[in-house]
Amino acid sequence: MRAVCQRAQSASVTVDGKVVGSFEGEGLVILLGVSVTDTEAEAVQVARKVAGLRMLDGERSLTDAGAPALVVSQFTLYGDVRKGRRPSWTRAAKGDQAEPLYERFTAELEAAGVRVERGVFGAMMDVSLTNSGPFTLIVDSDELAGPRRG
């Protein structure tokens, strides 16, 4: 599972011209990709890590600050561009596998006290945000389990 976390001062997601999720004030926009090997354990692990990351002003986390998160599903985070010019999506989980894990991730954030705004799973979405910093981190469940690099 991959979560691209961007600190933002405001954000919104629109589907078919209607705003379906938004926040004003400091929070995180989280683009979430689910791989074919992910399980509920990865969803819980990544959500807990994201909830506690000190990415907000004053070295605070989402839970410390009571700040919101806008979570948007994004299968393209698992695009493989090693061969040719067209990305391969074979590592990205299909919707029937990915959606329950997306829901588990958001539920775990909520259990940590985070106000979660959502996109619409699988929909074509327009995401707007005002980056703060910019400050962006990528949390990858494969890297959380392995030895520290560098």
Curated annotation (Swiss-Prot):
InterPro entries xref list: Daa-tRNA_deacyls_DTD, DTD-like_sf
Catalytic activity: glycyl-tRNA(Ala) + H2O = tRNA(Ala) + glycine + H(+); a D-aminoacyl-tRNA + H2O = a tRNA + a D-alpha-amino acid + H(+)
GO MF, one annotated term: D-tyrosyl-tRNA(Tyr) deacylase activity
Entry keyword annotation includes Transport: no
Keyword tags: Cytoplasm, Hydrolase, RNA-binding, tRNA-binding
SUPFAM superfamilies assigned: DTD-like
Keyword tRNA-binding: yes
Biological process according to GO: D-amino acid catabolic process
Pfam families: Tyr_Deacylase (PF02580)
Family: Belongs to the DTD family.
Quaternary structure and interacting proteins, as annotated: Homodimer.
HAMAP family: Deacylase_Dtd (MF_00518)
Entry-linked PANTHER family: D-AMINOACYL-TRNA DEACYLASE 1, D-TYROSYL-TRNA TYR DEACYLASE
Name by which UniProt lists this protein: D-aminoacyl-tRNA deacylase
Source organism of the structure: Micrococcus luteus (strain ATCC 4698 / DSM 20030 / JCM 1464 / CCM 169 / CCUG 5858 / IAM 1056 / NBRC 3333 / NCIMB 9278 / NCTC 2665 / VKM Ac-2230) (Micrococcus lysodeikticus)
Gene coding for it: dtd
